[in-house]
Each structure stands twice: as C-alpha cells, then as structure tokens.
C-alpha cells in the first residue's frame, strides 16, 4: 500500500511540475497570497523538523517542545510581518533575480554576494543530508525499500520537477505539500491528545519510563533528570537545548536565503500578514505534533517492552517512524507516510532550486544565467549529498545536527546584516566585516569547540567545559553583532 502511495505522490508532483513548465526559473511574483503563504510555511517544515527534532524530543522529553515553541512562533511571526516587507521593498528598487544578488546590490558589495553564495553552496549538502536521512529512514521503514535506493530515487524525483517547472513548480508543489502536512499533523495531534495521552496511568508510566535509562547514560551526563522536567540549570544539556532551540533554529530560519526569496515574491506589503499566518501555523503545528507524539511513545514502549522509545526504535532518527508504524492504525500510518514525503519534498526542492540559482547566477555572474550550469550544479551536489547521507547514516542525532550546522552558520553570519538592511544601513564594508566575523567564529566553533561536530570534522575538541555544548550560532552571533554595531557607531561619530 505504501509503495502505491509513494508512486501516486511521484505522479502528482510530476504532474504539477509538468503543468508549470515554461515558468520563470528564477524569481517571479506570486499570483496568490495564500499559495505563497502555504509555500513559505511548507518550506519552514521538513523531515529534519518532524523526524529529527521529533526524535530529539522522544529521547529527551518535554523540555524540547516547551523550550522551542514560544521563541519559534514569536520570531517567525515578527520576522515575517516586520523584516519581510523591508526585504520586499528593497527588491522593488533593485529588481534582483535571487535573494543573494539582492543583498549584494543593496549594500553595493559584490563581495558580500559572493561570500554568502559560497557559504550557502558549501552548507546546502549538510541540510540535504538531514532531509534525506529522515525521508530515507521513513521510506525504508514503511516500504522495505533499501535506504540507498530510497534516497537516490527521491533525489532524482526532486531534480526532475525543478528542471521541468523551475520556481513556479517549487511554489505550486510547496502549496500542495503544505495542505498535506496540515492534515497529517492534525490527525496525529488528535490521536496523540485524545487516545495515547488518555490511557490509564499515562503520566506515571512516562515518569517510570525514565527508570529504563541506564546509569551512566548520556542523558544523565548531560544533566537531564526525567522526561517531564527541564535539565539541571546551566548543565550541558540545558545549554545544548537552549542554544539550539532558542537561537539556532528560530534565528537561522529567518535568515535562510530560500525563505527570504518567498518574501521577495510577495504581491505587495499587505501580503505579509497572510504569509505570516501560514508561516507560523504549518511549522508550529507539525513540530509540536510530532514532538508530543514521540514523547508519548516512551509511555507505550515502557509498558509493552520495558524500554524507552529510543531503545525500542534504535536511534533518535528512528523514533518517529517506529512510533507511527507501531502506535497508529494502518490507515493513519499511510496518511502520515504521505505527510513525511510532502515535508521532505518541500525542503529538498527549495534547497536544490536555491543551489542551482546561486551557482548559475550569484557565483558565476553573467547577464544571462547558464541553465546547463544550474542543472549540472544540482547533479553534483545531489551526488555529494547522497554520498554524505550514506556515510553519516547511523550517526547519533545526525538529522538535528546537520540542520543546526546549516542554520547556525547562516544565522550567525547574516542576522546583523539583515537587521542593518531593515534600519536602512547600506555600508557594504561593515556588512562584509560582520559577515566574515560571524562565519569565521561559528565555523571555528564547529571545527574545534562544539562537542559533536568537532569530533566529526577534525577530531580535536578544545576543552571549554560545559560551553562545549553551546551551539556555534551563539559565539558567531555575538562576534558579528559586535563588529557591525561597533563599525556603525564609529562611523557616526
């Protein structure tokens, strides 16, 4: 049944792309505020959010959604209704084909465009890994198809739709997938709240499930004490989830080029209230739903197997697929399989389109972008991402980590620049200095300080005590902000 669903999904997205052929491959105005809002909201959600952060919540407990929800919703809404119109106004003056081109022209700094383009292209494969690991795990769990075949086939499908329909295909497919994600999330939320969490002794079983965590486990070392409480204040775990969920994800989201592009496509300034509603509703609904579901799985697995959800599933990336396959009726599982495919597709097609336009328009700057370069760059990065996906599959919390890497470095580098644009600042040298400071600091933190990535990339971890668990965006954002503010103040004196 799930194989038929997957084939039907491929037919639908292929048909939408086919009907979009001949549309603008680059930027174009949206015909409908609702379609752009659905596209924006759908792009904000992905398998990395559903499976990666759902799995993180299933491993750690309620401190994950409770820490994330308020800053996530507040920042996304504020950024869309306040920063979004400023970005739109800037491009009305400039008329750029991509967000990266617009930033460079706004600050009259080709170097800023090139730096952002290079960083974006360098980091996209890591975010692709997060998406592909998530959807690959799901396809394998629900169909039995080999993991490698699953991720290769899904990547080819995304590539084909982008080549066929360009930006028009991306927006229209996002709109369809956004509706699917909303419906699927509502079904999971209803079953979680009114069925799973209503079983006798649910809360006491969830508390007791913590006893299945063995002494000396990573959770204890990080400072976590139960599924229903926050970790010890200023412990490794507290710093990890606070800097990840309050800074990396919300701040990273509002600076990502593929999301800023949606703002540039708005019909007018009045569009942003509609865009903001969908931009908050779709990701917040999906993230909270699957986090609550994954946490609830611990009560079930403890009663039935005497294990926590991560022990029963075999890893954080497997918690959500395992729970949907075992804890929900088969008809619901089929719908949720479609939901995950939709979430993965919206993110991957935005990333692939961003990558091709960045290379063909922003790195190789010509009056008429070379489409052969655009398509060829997609093929090369897809191959690289597939190799990385297969190599990194099985790494602990790889989905959440790969997502945080992309969000963190972009967020640390770009937030002061974006805020500077909002306030009408146009000094390109200041923007470049701030960008370089944020990028260099966050990359250094990734390579030599952060507890997980430093071991993965260099094998060298400088001992900063509990601060090894602080996300790279925090030091990077401090440095980039100080540089931008200091240079701006010095110039005004």
State where each predicted segment sits.
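Membrane-interface helix-loop-helix modules in multi-pass membrane proteins
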Residues: 27-95, 248-252, 259-261, 268-303, ...
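Selective recognition of specific alpha-helical transmembrane segments in multi-pass small-molecule
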Residues: 7, 12, 42, 74, ...
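Loop-to-transmembrane helix boundary motifs in multi-pass membrane proteins
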Residues: 106-114, 121, 357-397
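Membrane-interface "cap" regions at the ends of multi-pass membrane proteins
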Residues: 1-52, 165
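Helix-loop-helix module between adjacent transmembrane segments
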Residues: 67-162, 247-252, 342-350
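A generic transmembrane alpha-helix motif of multi-pass inner-membrane proteins
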Residues: 1-16, 429-493
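Hydrophobic, small-residue-rich membrane helices and short re-entrant helix-turn-helix hairpins
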Residues: 23, 95-108, 165-176, 255-288, ...
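Hydrophobic alpha-helical segments and their helix-loop junctions in multi-pass secondary transporters
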Residues: 4-5, 13-21, 124, 128-132, ...
